[in-house]
């Protein structure tokens, strides 16, 4: 589909098509992301409200649906306060260094068969590489802010992200081993073949079942990577107020939160693609096959995002040493052990993948 649009555009506009197409793709990615983040925040506040037996936002617009618009306007109109002793250049560029990798990842994420901005063969490697870059913006913000609280938060973020990146990487390596491809579309298609898929029970052929420990490790590590509760010691309110964001206000502060929620959506989308069959329906039938694959992916991502929120509402914050212990002493040994088990499984007569 993308190739057809490109060929048609080049035929009509010639050399002008390339910069125009880059701009169009950027808009196609960014605008829906902004809307998704705005209403994800509203859904989070609503869902936590219901879990706390209260209503949640319900004043701005019908049923509170305009609350995200009001929040955006509030942040846009706030004065940007810059402390006098900050490293100005690094202070200003840090929020962008956190946000840009989160946006760039969407270039290779497929939304259904043949609907992807760039269908590259090394898509999984690209995601793993780009997702590691955001921590530099966090470290830069902590260093440039000239604040002890911000610096402590940045150091915590660096240690936490490095710790859980390893476990996430091993979890994705197991998916790579069973799929035999780094292409995200090929990984999704590989989950919808086999004995159960032939019977029309796709849900039992997805990677979540044979790779169940990796599924859990990847998603929980994703919660830690995004600094979400109960892993939010990076911005622990009771200790360091807001961590690396403490000296930011207005849109600088908003960009950090925007990146956090975009990363939540990325983790949920990657979990759905790697372990939950992507855009495939759970069961084959006339009704489920009539629903476009994009909507199945959307449903899975929405449910995983709701789990993010449920975790926030249900668990207390871990201590910093507990978070490090979980990453290094539990997740990494577990993923290495399961990696070896899967390698032996693939080479055994009971191989269910190839």
Curated annotation (Swiss-Prot):
Catalytic activity, EC: 7.1.1.-
Molecular function as annotated in GO: NADH dehydrogenase activity; oxidoreductase activity, acting on NAD(P)H, quinone or similar compound as acceptor; quinone binding
Membrane topology: Multi-pass membrane protein
Biological processes, Gene Ontology terms: aerobic respiration
Reactions listed under catalytic activity: a quinone + NADH + 5 H(+)(in) = a quinol + NAD(+) + 4 H(+)(out)
Keywords: Cell inner membrane, Cell membrane, Membrane, NAD, Quinone, Translocase, Transmembrane, Transmembrane helix, Ubiquinone
Matches recorded under Pfam families: NADHdh
Subcellular location: Cell inner membrane
Transmembrane feature ranges: 22-42, 91-111, 124-144, 168-188, 203-223, 255-275, 291-311, 326-346
Enzymatic class: translocase
Gene Ontology CC entries for this record: plasma membrane
Matching NCBIfam families: PRK06076.1-2, PRK06076.1-3
Summary of subunit composition and partner proteins: NDH-1 is composed of 14 different subunits. Subunits NuoA, H, J, K, L, M, N constitute the membrane sector of the complex.
General function of this protein: NDH-1 shuttles electrons from NADH, via FMN and iron-sulfur (Fe-S) centers, to quinones in the respiratory chain. The immediate electron acceptor for the enzyme in this species is believed to be ubiquinone. Couples the redox reaction to proton translocation (for every two electrons transferred, four hydrogen ions are translocated across the cytoplasmic membrane), and thus conserves the redox energy in a proton gradient. This subunit may bind ubiquinone.
Protein family membership: Belongs to the complex I subunit 1 family.
Classification via HAMAP family: NDH1_NuoH (MF_01350)
Stated name of the protein: NADH-quinone oxidoreductase subunit H
């Amino acid at each position: 589909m993308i190739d057809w649009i490109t060929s048609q555009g080049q035929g009509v506009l010639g050399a002008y098509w390339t910069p125009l197409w880059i701009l169009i793709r950027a808009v196609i990615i960014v605008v829906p992301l902004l809307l998704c983040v705005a209403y994800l925040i509203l859904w989070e506040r609503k869902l936590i409200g219901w879990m706390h037996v209260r209503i949640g936002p319900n004043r701005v617009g019908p049923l509170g649906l305009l609350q995200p618009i009001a929040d955006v306007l509030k942040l846009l109109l706030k004065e940007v306060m810059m402390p006098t002793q900050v490293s100005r250049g690094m202070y200003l560029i840090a929020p962008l260094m956190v946000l840009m990798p989160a946006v760039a990842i969407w270039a290779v994420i497929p939304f259904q068969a043949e609907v992807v901005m760039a269908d590259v063969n090394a898509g999984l490697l690209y995601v793993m590489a780009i997702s590691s870059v955001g921590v530099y913006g966090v470290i830069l913000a902590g260093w440039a802010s000239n604040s002890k609280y911000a610096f402590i938060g940045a150091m915590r973020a660096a240690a936490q992200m490095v710790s859980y990146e390893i476990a996430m990487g091993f979890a994705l390596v197991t998916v790579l081993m069973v799929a035999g491809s780094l292409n995200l579309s090929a990984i999704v298609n590989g989950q919808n073949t086999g004995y159960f898929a032939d019977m029309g029970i796709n849900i039992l052929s997805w990677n979540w079942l044979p790779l169940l420990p990796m599924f859990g490790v990847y998603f929980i590590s994703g919660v830690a990577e995004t600094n979400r509760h109960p892993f939010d010691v990076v911005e622990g309110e009771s200790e360091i107020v807001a961590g690396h964001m403490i000296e930011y206000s207005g849109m600088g502060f908003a960009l950090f939160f925007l990146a956090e929620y975009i990363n939540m959506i990325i983790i949920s989308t990657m979990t759905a693609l790697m372990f939950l069959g992507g855009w495939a329906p759970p069961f084959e039938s006339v009704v489920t096959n009539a629903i476009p694959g994009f909507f199945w992916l959307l449903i899975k991502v929405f449910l995983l995002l709701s789990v993010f929120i449920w975790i926030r509402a249900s668990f207390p914050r871990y201590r910093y040493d507990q978070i490090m212990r979980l990453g290094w002493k539990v997740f990494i040994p577990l993923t290495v052990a399961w990696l070896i088990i899967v390698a032996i499984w693939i080479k055994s007569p009971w191989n269910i993948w190839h």
